Curated annotation (Swiss-Prot):
GO terms for molecular function: toxin activity. This is Cytotoxin 3b. The keyword Secreted applies. Belongs to the three-finger toxin family. Short-chain subfamily. Type IA cytotoxin sub-subfamily.
Length: 81
């Protein structure tokens, strides 16, 4: 009985994420990265002239301001970028 209980505890720890970690897409959305502590936003950067083609994606702590040439879209759920 103790072995079964210990096994269930180990499986629970392995299956559950003990601390919430955000996952953000890399430039190619098939791949993603787990964000380090403090980086709690995903972002997508693209040129204003070509809004359908992202230039960069990843994790960030604060969403940058848009400029005349570059636009940022930020979000805070897994793989939302």
């Amino acid at each position: 009985m103790k072995t079964l209980l210990l096994t269930l505890v180990v499986v629970t720890i392995v299956c559950l994420d003990l601390g919430y970690t955000l996952k953000c897409n890399k430039l190619v959305p098939l791949f993603y990265k787990t964000c380090p502590a403090g980086k709690n936003l995903c972002y997508k950067m693209f040129m204003v002239a070509t809004p359908k083609v992202p230039v960069k994606r990843g994790c960030i702590d604060v969403c940058p301001k848009n400029s005349a040439l570059v636009k940022y879209v930020c979000c805070n759920t897994d793989r939302c970028n």
